[in-house]
Amino acid sequence: MNHADMTKSRLLAVDDNSDSAELIARVAAKCGYDARSMTDPSALERVLDEWKPQVLTLDLCMPEEDGISVLSLLTRSGFSGHLLIISGQDEWFRKTASRLASARGLNVADDLCKPVDLKALRELLTQLANGRPAGELRRAANGE
């Protein structure tokens, strides 16, 4: 591993749809992240402990384990990175999940609708990699 690899931010894309998870990981890699994807959240706690990603993208609707229970796992595990909630559910559902995650102390950077706007995802990931705070990202996205 060279020095550049050691300084890359790590992103983990969690989605039961392997195509979606891999697409997010590829976009993140093009933005300079060391990116991985996983489709089975049952191993998430181990991966968080061993790999310690700085950014995690989470699909809320997965057959094996729903996103809300994953939010509980993230809280219990002390995840302190940025969380991007991604779902094909309506805006109310995504915003409610974002508020729940924030209330549990998670650092929600944004919530995105599937299919993901790749340009918006690239911009968001670039801003996160450059250290822009999540709250500032949400305010900018809302035109505040």
Language-model segments: what does each one mean?
Residues 7-19, 24-28:
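Conserved acidic segment of CheY-like receiver
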Residues 37-55:
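Acidic, metal-coordinating helix/loop segments flanking the phosphotransfer/catalytic sites
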Residues 39-40, 66-72:
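Acidic catalytic/metal-coordinating carboxylates
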Residues 58-59:
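Active-site residues of response regulator receiver
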Residues 62:
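Receiver (REC) domain active-site loop signature in two-component systems and cognate sites
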Residues 69-76, 89-111:
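Alpha4 helix (beta4-alpha4-beta5 surface) of REC/receiver domains from two-component response regulators
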Residues 92-93, 113-129:
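C-terminal output helix
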Residues 130-144:
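CheY-like receiver
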